[in-house]
From Swiss-Prot:
InterPro entries: FAD-bd_oxidored_4_C, FAD-bd_PCMH, FAD-bd_PCMH-like_sf, FAD-bd_PCMH_sub1, FAD-bd_PCMH_sub2, FAD-linked_Oxase-like_C, FAD-oxidored/transferase_4, Oxid_FAD_bind_N. This is Probable D-2-hydroxyglutarate dehydrogenase, mitochondrial. The gene is D2HGDH. It comes from Oryza sativa subsp. japonica. The lineage of its organism: Eukaryota, Viridiplantae, Streptophyta, Embryophyta, Tracheophyta. Residues 131-310 form the FAD-binding PCMH-type domain. Residues 1-80 form a transit peptide.
Length: 559
């Protein structure tokens, strides 16, 4: 019975395109979606198309004297998670004076030294409005040499600094805590070289990820990472936080994709590790110290990164499951059946879908007939459309027969695929519209991943709503607790329980967002005291005056 029903579903909903007809012939280009066609055709692949991600994006207006960000949507409520442990300003740091400003103007010019209160205020606050510093100075270097001179001077004066990219982080890592000098890398946005044979991109740290994606796609390649914030985040910030994102399951972490770095150390020394070699087994591979160190060991100024080939066939499926065990089994089945073409495996619970439908404009539920407990978004990319399509259809047929999938849709065209991704990527945006959001980014063994969501619902009760979603393919849970307003009572129900529970599972309290200010004092939940002490030793060696991004990453007690 199950096989007949599934086969019937395949026959009824196979894509309606005529033989030889392409999406291009219908005018369905990635940036020309037109009106959404809601008659979803199931089990159909998208030929030669790459999805376009939705997420938090900023418009950046730049001239000789200005570089500022304006959010495309208005964040009316604050987002809270883990009230950062209060830290005292380090009295060893100097206070900025007029002589300092004069020196910076001598190397950057007047346009590169920003003291305007409104413009500095934008750089002082994270995009969620949660963390706000009191810096009086924003510097806009345009070269590695200028960054080197800035750090050399600040180190000699013991002026603390905070490097800043697109400022899209969630843990307070890219904004000042007190009066640190802000060094924006946005003016360093040049593409240096691209190796068309090997797909190796060399660029400056201030390049916006989306711009790099467009550049390499025109060359027949893609960036190995893709984020909802790609319209505003910088590649240097991605490297410094070891950003994960939606392609992690296919291409792995940046530790595997980054071939070389140029980094400016605290004393102004330029550390040239900008190799483009795939193999180099000469001594310690120092670049890995700076990937994920959040600007606390040095400021990344240039990057050489390996970009995978852009594949012509893309499929996006939106599936429903009755329980979390089915999601786990579906992941295992996808890895076995889809193998090399599996490029994303995202999951969302029904609370996420309900929230997205309520607060996101222009999205439509692909499976509106019956509510389900869990939803899975699967993306495949490959080089042979007919092969990929047949492989995906066979996988879905078996999954329905085995009872792993309750219902499912595969996008017929790019607008439908974009709708699927808009739902997944828009959950964070929708969450903010409720009120206070307590956000946690956890790495947990897949079999235990949803247990913390259920435990949190029991603890929170009717005080708030708990959402669970994330990158199931790599065990990364985004746990969001929503409430109409922030309260100490709610926070007490969440913390330290969420960290203690994660630690007991030998998980990580930060899967991809970093530690920043928010979790610096909580690193012991994921790292041993010996490991933390070794990290502190490295920090003291490379930054003895501790001027680089202070109060972040490591507890103040070990420095």
């Amino acid at each position: 019975m199950a096989r007949r029903a599934a086969a019937g579903l395949l026959r009824r909903h196979l894509g309606p395109l005529a033989a030889g007809e392409t999406l291009q012939a219908r005018g369905m280009y990635p940036k020309q979606y037109g009106a959404a066609n809601h008659a979803f055709s199931r089990f159909y692949s998208i030929q030669g198309q790459q999805r376009s991600l939705y997420g938090f994006r900023t418009n950046v207006e730049t001239d000789d004297t200005q570089q500022s960000a304006r959010m495309n949507f208005e964040v009316q409520k604050r987002s809270f998670s883990s009230a950062a442990a209060h830290v005292q300003r380090n009295p060893a740091y100097s206070v900025l004076n007029s002589d300092d400003v004069s020196y910076f103007k001598s190397i950057l010019g007047d346009s590169g030294v920003v003291q305007d209160e409104d413009r500095v205020s934008v750089a002082n606050m994270d995009w969620m409005g949660k963390y706000k510093g009191s810096s009086q100075l924003l510097l806009l270097p345009k070269s590695t040499a200028e960054v080197s001179k800035i750090l050399s001077y600040c180190n000699s004066r013991r002026l603390a600094v905070v490097p800043q990219g697109g400022n899209t982080g969630l843990v307070g890592g890219s904004v000042p805590v007190y009066d640190e000098v802000i060094i924006s890398l946005g003016g360093m946005d040049k593409i240096i070289t691209f190796d068309n044979v090997n797909g190796i991109l060399t660029c400056e740290a201030g390049c916006v990820l989306e711009n790099l994606s467009s550049y390499v796609e025109n060359k027949g390649f893609i960036m190995p990472l893709d984020l909802g914030a790609k319209g505003s985040c910088h590649i240097g910030g991605n490297i410094s936080t070891n950003a994960g994102g939606l392609r992690f399951i296919r291409y792995g972490s940046l530790h595997g994709s980054v071939l070389g770095l140029e980094v400016v150390l605290a004393d102004g020394t330029v550390l040239d590790m900008l190799t483009t070699l795939r193999k180099d087994n000469t001594g310690y591979d120092l670049k890995h110290l700076f990937i994920g160190s959040e600007g606390s060991l040095g400021i990344v100024t240039k990057i050489a990164i390996l970009t995978p080939a852009k594949l012509p066939s893309t499929n996006v499926a939106f599936l429903s499951c009755n329980d979390y065990i089915s999601c786990q089994k579906l992941l295992l089945a996808a890895r076995r059946s889809l193998g090399e073409i599996l490029s994303a495996f995202e999951f969302m619970d029904r609370h996420c879908i309900n929230l997205a439908m309520k607060y996101l404009e222009g999205v439509h539920n692909p499976l509106p007939v019956s509510p389900f407990n869990f939803y899975v978004l699967i993306e495949t990319t490959g080089s042979d459309e007919s092969y990929d399509k047949a492989k995906l259809e066979a996988f879905l047929l078996r999954s329905m027969e085995d009872g792993l999938v309750a219902d499912g849709v595969i996008a017929q065209d790019i607008s439908q695929a974009s709708n699927f991704w808009r739902i997944r990527e828009g959950i964070s945006e929708a969450s903010v519209k409720v009120g206070a959001v307590y956000k946690y980014d956890l790495s947990i063994p897949v079999e235990k991943l949803y247990d913390i969501v259920e435990e949190m619902r029991s603890r929170v009760g009717d005080m708030g709503q708990v959402l669970g979603y994330g990158h199931l393919g790599d065990g990364n849970l985004h746990l969001n607790i929503l409430s109409t307003k922030y309260s100490d009572k709610m926070l007490a129900q969440i913390e330290p329980f969420v960290y203690e529970w994660t630690s007991k599972q030998r998980g990580s309290i930060s899967a991809e967002h970093g530690l920043g200010l928010m979790k610096a004092e909580k690193i012991h939940y994921s790292k041993s005291s010996e490991a933390v002490q070794l990290m502190a030793s490295i920090k003291k060696l490379l930054d003895p005056n501790s001027i680089l991004n202070p109060y972040k990453v490591l507890p103040q007690s070990v420095l």
